[in-house]
């Protein structure tokens, strides 16, 4: 309790020395005063649990996979709140990992969709899960077309494949990035002729297209592998064009232009591995983007504003606290959209 500095064990879900490992699979979700999370009690496997912070009660919400086996709610990283209902991945022991739901208003739990018939499971949302209105967009494998973009409309419980980007194989949407701009999803995918590149799906008219092929041919540019952030209408992300290494790129969604923002670590500096911007941190403060990047002097803090890119440190070696210097006299590069 931050008001009186007291600390206490809230509950002992699994008696003994092993522990219940709450939140192992899924990020805790707060609905009203109640926390929802996965935990294992030692008898029913890892299942969905809840803790009401208003009265300190804790209970198992549902035993999705009956017996000692685990339902593993939230495995793979998909959990999303729509109204009073939590949507998540779970395995009931017969249909594999599929999309499930729990309505917190009436305590009902059900399988929302069985995308891949049989016991294998479609493992939805392993790479991406984004809510647009009442509809969840996510990747899933139906067993025939591989991992593609799917959707589930929570208002009418309908589920469908949005696009088969890579016919007869997986396009693996969202493997390196997925972000919503207005009604349009921007995500990484591969179509079989080009590698993992930047794609888009307009949810208002159901059109899907490749936004940019940053690295020509079958190799991948892997957009957003380390960072992706929206500034106004522009997405900033890391990508590898095959010649300058992994550097800072941008896509203006208002005019469909894509460009390399800066070649921070030029090819003349120890090969073409690139600066790997945002590998450890990225944050937007006002109009300025702050991120880490690699130069010959090591990994340091950098910043970008429209029209310029500036190093905020000097000297050699990696910064480890402190080391911040005035930007005056720091390395500066300027790039403009093409």
Q: Which residue stretches match the model-derived regions?
A:
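Feature 14080 marks short, conserved micro-sites in well-ordered regions
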Residues: 1-313, 319
């Amino acid at each position: 309790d931050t008001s009186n500095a007291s600390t206490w064990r809230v509950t002992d879900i699994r008696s003994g020395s092993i522990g219940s490992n709450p939140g192992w699979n899924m990020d805790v979700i707060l609905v009203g005063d109640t926390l929802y999370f996965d935990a294992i009690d030692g008898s029913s496997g890892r299942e969905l649990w809840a803790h009401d912070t208003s009265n300190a009660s804790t209970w198992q919400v549902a035993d999705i996979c009956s017996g000692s086996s685990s339902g593993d709610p939230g495995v793979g990283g998909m959990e999303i709140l729509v109204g009073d209902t939590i949507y998540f991945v779970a395995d009931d022991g017969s249909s594999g990992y599929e999309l499930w739901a729990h309505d917190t208003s009436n305590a009902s739990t059900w399988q929302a969709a069985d995308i891949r018939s049989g016991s294998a499971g479609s493992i939805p949302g392993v790479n991406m899960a984004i809510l647009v209105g009442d509809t969840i967009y996510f990747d899933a494998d139906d067993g025939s077309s591989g991992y593609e973009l799917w959707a589930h409309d929570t208002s009418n419980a309908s589920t469908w494949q949005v696009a088969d980007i890579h016919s007869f194989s997986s396009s693996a949407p969202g493997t390196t990035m997925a972000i919503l701009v207005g009604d349009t999803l921007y995500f990484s995918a591969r179509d079989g002729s080009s590698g993992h590149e930047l794609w888009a799906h307009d949810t208002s008219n159901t059109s899907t297209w490749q936004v940019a092929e940053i690295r020509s041919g079958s190799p991948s540019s892997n957009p957003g592998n380390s960072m992706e952030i929206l500034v106004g209408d522009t997405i900033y992300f890391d990508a590898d064009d095959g010649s300058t290494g992994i550097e800072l790129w941008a896509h203006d969604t208002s005019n469909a232009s894509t460009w390399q923002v800066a070649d921070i670590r030029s090819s003349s500096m120890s090969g073409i591995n690139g600066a790997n911007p945002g590998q450890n941190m990225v944050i937007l403060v006002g109009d300025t983007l702050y991120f880490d990047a690699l130069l010959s002097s090591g990994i340091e803090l950098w910043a970008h504003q429209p029209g310029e890119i500036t190093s905020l440190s000097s000297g050699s070696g990696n910064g480890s606290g402190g080391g911040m210097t005035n930007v005056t006299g720091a390395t500066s590069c300027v790039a403009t959209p093409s």
